[in-house]
Every structure is written in C-alpha cells, then in structure tokens.
C-alpha cells in the first residue's frame, strides 16, 4: 500500500527550520547516487526474489528490472543501478530553490518554494497521476494537504551522551528504555 510521501516534507521542513545548508547541498549526495552506483548483492538479490511482485507495477518494473525477459531480470551485484526519474525530481527541487533565491527570497523561503513544488506543483501532479494510473488512491489534494508536525523528542542519557528519539508513535520508547 502507498501513503502520501512524508519524507521529502520532513527533510525540507527540518532543513528550513533548523538547518544551515541549502537544499542543493543536502540533495547532492542523493543526486550522485541516483546518477548510478554499484548495487550491492543484498539489494540486487532482493529485487530478483521479488520480481514477480515488482512486475505488477509499471513504474517499479521499469526502475528495478533492468534486464526484462532474461532469466535474471534484476541487476547483478556490482552493476551500475541508475534512478533517472529520482535524479530529475531532485534536480527540479534544486532548480526551484535557486530560482527563488534569484528572486530575492531567503534560504528558508527558497526551501519552502521547493516544498510547494513537490506537494502542490508539477511533481505533485505526476505523483497523483502515476499513482492513480496504477489503481492507487493518492490525489493532488492529499499531497497539498500533507502537513509536517514538529514534536518535542523523547530524550535519555546513555554513557553521558544525550540520545533523542521520536515520540510514542514509533518504537522509540522501547529503545530509550533499553539503553537504561
């Protein structure tokens, strides 16, 4: 099942509100990886093991099954794995940030312009279209209405180190208790 993507929102809000770097700076390593990297054995073999399930989904099939019709359709260990569409999406976010900065917006405002493009602009259009094309339920309204909630983290000390984790909606309390 698919849910409204929250990771991009979380990253951009945290960067805008608490960070000092640009969106371009933090996305650069991901862009390099999307340009292509030698895939590790565990990932390549997992793709191969799950290829029948992957084949049910047009876009996943196009990304992960690099040798359609061959006995092994997944990439081999060490083969360069490329995610062109991911790279292009990340570049669009950077383009939006740069454009906003050129128009006089500050760093925070420029990051929120990229956020807006992802959740309300052409990227949102493509997410909604491709999801619905495959029977999914995510709409552009879902994307536009997505909100990030900033919460006070849980905290404990472990060997004189402060450890912070998310609140009770994940398994953080268990981890923090196990440290003590």
Residue ranges and their predicted role:
Residues 1-180:
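Feature marks proteins synthesized as precursors that undergo proteolytic processing into two chains
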């Amino acid at each position: 099942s698919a849910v409204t993507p929250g990771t991009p929102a979380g990253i951009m809000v945290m960067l805008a509100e608490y960070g000092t770097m640009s969106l371009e700076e933090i996305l650069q390593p991901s862009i390099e990886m999307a340009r292509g990297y030698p895939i590790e054995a565990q990932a390549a073999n997992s793709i191969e093991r799950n290829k029948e399930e992957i084949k049910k989904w047009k876009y996943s099939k196009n990304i992960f099954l690099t040798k359609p019709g061959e006995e092994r359709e997944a990439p081999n260990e060490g083969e360069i794995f490329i995610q062109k569409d991911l790279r292009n999406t990340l570049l669009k976010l950077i383009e939006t940030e740069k454009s906003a900065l050129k128009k006089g917006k500050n760093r925070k405002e420029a990051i929120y312009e990229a956020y807006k493009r992802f959740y309300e602009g052409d990227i949102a259009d493509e997410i909604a279209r491709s999801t619905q094309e495959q029977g999914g339920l995510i709409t552009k309204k879902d994307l536009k209405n997505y909100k990030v909630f900033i919460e006070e983290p849980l905290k404990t000390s472990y060997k004189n180190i402060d450890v912070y984790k998310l609140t009770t909606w994940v398994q953080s309390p268990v981890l923090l208790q196990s440290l003590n």
